[in-house]
Regions:
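Secreted/periplasmic carbohydrate-active enzymes, especially glycoside hydrolases
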Residues: 1-217
Length: 217
């Protein structure tokens, strides 16, 4: 993931693969076709010139506060995945029905449809198993979205700032005699809008924080 101020481009062996302008989220580039076995030169070009009018954001471009970062913020990673892999795993809890809906994106880059087995295990963080299920799946070539609703049982533990109970879900994919997995943590909570406050699980939340300029990155 890359994070500088304006634009970054990625090249493999001198050929541009793509360009992105995101800052608040990781910038990911898919290099599967270019990274064949052997030696390659990977180049990242960071362009911090002012690309857009920034008059209203001058605190982010002058030497008095944030100034020019002149580089890359965050981790730089090159990661290898199986041809059939879990690209994304998201959890959407529902405290009223005591369930969590899992949104799973599976990539199949084998060039043809394939069958597999998806296993989902939910544990209390550092504790007992809440749910364990497996499903046979058929994957078309490319991106596949799988939606699964899982019961969390009768005695769910709710998350809030004072009792931040967490659960961990692990998704395991077996396809073409290869395995891939992804883990995330989540809390059982409901965020709603009250009359004058944001509410978590029906209770008002009093937000507090600090603004520290000129200390990032």
């Amino acid at each position: 993931g890359l994070g500088d101020v304006y634009k970054r481009q990625v090249y493999v062996d001198g050929k541009e693969i793509g360009a992105k302008e995101h800052l608040s989220v990781p910038n990911r580039f898919l290099l599967s076709k270019q990274m064949t076995p052997g030696m390659h030169i990977l180049t990242i070009c960071v362009d911090n010139r002012l690309k857009y009018p920034m008059d209203q954001w001058n605190h982010g471009t002058t030497e008095y506060t944030q100034t020019n970062w002149n580089g890359i913020v965050g981790k730089i990673e090159l990661t290898a995945y199986e041809k059939t892999n879990i690209h994304a795993l998201k959890a959407y809890p529902d405290i009223e029905t005591r369930t969590v809906t899992l949104d799973i994106t599976v990539n199949n880059t084998t060039g043809q449809p394939t069958n597999g087995l998806l296993q989902l295990v939910i544990n209390e963080k550092g504790g007992k198993t809440v749910s364990e299920q497996s499903f046979p799946i058929t994957l078309k070539e490319g991106s596949n979205q799988l939606i699964k609703e899982i019961s969390m049982g009768k005695n769910i533990k709710l998350w809030n700032e004072f009792t931040p109970y967490l659960y961990e879900v692990k998704a395991m994919l077996t396809a073409d005699n290869k395995q891939d997995s992804k883990n995330i943590t989540f809390g059982m909570r409901e965020v709603t809008q009250g009359k004058h406050h944001i509410q978590i699980n029906g209770r008002n939340v009093h937000l507090r924080g600090a603004l520290d300029c000129c200390v990032f990155p």
